[in-house]
């Protein structure tokens, strides 16, 4: 076969593959993405319609699905019912280790969104006081991971307390009704418990809160990298809008949560929105959480946590959020 003919065949194959990739992307008619009250940027994105505006010229619609916690977002991603989901970084790592095919691609917040919470009348003032007590928690979320690490530091384990597994809103209700003694809280519900019922945050550790990250299913990222970049472009527009329109951000959160201005102000006081690129700071924080969970027995000893973190964090799309 002549060199010219071989080059023509190679060119034809390359063109065919490029056409196939374009066709695969063109087949996407709907992007399914979550919104969550623990992710203020997602609420701005939904409310302002930035993503719809970005995609409308290609006839791609947007379907919004609410996530009540990282565990729900991971459940939706694993089931293939959403393409993009909001979680805490450490929760995403647990999902990845458990076989959830996801990539973390963007930072939507650096929050102090979880702490250990109790009522004034319980006498609980430190983590050691939780021994034998009933603690409400949502398994597989940053508050759950935060609780495990706090117990570990106090030389306790989950076996030393009575875990009551509830979704975040039900955890707050259970605490206020007296059904549990403590709660691994999550904002804005935690802020509401503070402001509205005088709940006390008896253990705080901002450094043990992991970053808020946006995740995408591996298959979607592989088949539609250009669309992923466009989603992040819209996300970045929403994040910058939130930073420069703080009063409107507060109003948006009030509208979605049905909570008071005072509660949302408390949430926003401990929510930083100045980061977006995912990289080494997130790797370091998530790795530290993973190693602590492995030491506590939540992650099996034979798991290579560092490899799992490296597999989770995908920096390819970082330029889309600059």
Model-derived regions: residue spans:
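N-terminal export leaders
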Residues: 5-9
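Bacterial N-terminal signal peptides
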Residues: 10-19
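Sec/Tat signal peptide C-region and signal peptidase I cleavage site
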Residues: 20-26
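Short, glycine-/small- and polar/acidic-enriched structural segments
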Residues: 27-157, 162-167, 181-184, 200-201, ...
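Short, solvent-exposed loop/beta-turn-alpha elements that line the ligand-binding surface or hinge
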Residues: 52-60, 273-282, 305
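Pocket-lining segment of extracytoplasmic ligand-binding domains
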Residues: 90, 163-164, 169-255
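Secondary-structure end/capping motifs
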Residues: 222-300
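Conserved C-terminal helix/tail region of periplasmic/extracytoplasmic solute-binding proteins
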Residues: 294-322
